[in-house]
Amino acid sequence: MSDKGSRGEREDKSGAAIRDALRQIQAAVCDYKIVPDERPMIAAELRRMAKHADVVLTTGGTGVGPRDVTPEATRDVIEKELPGFAEAMRMESYKVTPRAIISRAMAGIHGKTLIVNLPGSPKAVAECLAVVLPAIPHTVELIRGEVVECARPTESNQ
C-alpha cells in the first residue's frame, strides 16, 4: 500500500521482495497491485484478490503515520483474526530493532483466503516472510478444511 507507489512516483521494492521470496519457494504469484493508502480501496482490493487466491500478502501502511490504514482495511474484510502471525513477526523483528513495536500489522481469514500484512521496507519484508512462510501452507490447508487431524503421532507420543 503506497500513495506514491500507486502514482508511479516510487519503485515498489517491498512488493518485489515478496515476489522474489515466493518464487524461491515455487509459489505462484497470481496477482499484484499497488493500492493507495485509502481504507475503502484497500478493503475492496483485498476482497477482489481473495476471490482467486489462497494467500494475499500486503506490504506497507502498518505503522502509525496518518495515512497508515492497512490494518483497519484488513480488519474490515476478515472474518477471523490470526494474531499469532503478527505477534511472531513483531517478536522476531524486535530482535533487529526496537521500532518493531510500532507495527500494527495483522493477519486473518476472509472466506478461504489467508491475508497477512507485512511491513513496508524490503529488509523487514524479508525478515517477516522468513518468520511466517513456514506456517502458511498448513494454515491454508486448515482454512480449506483439508486437515482433519492436526497432531501427528511421533515416536515420543505414541
Task: Annotate each language-model stretch with its function.
Residues 1-158:
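Non-catalytic beta/alpha edge segments that cap or flank active sites
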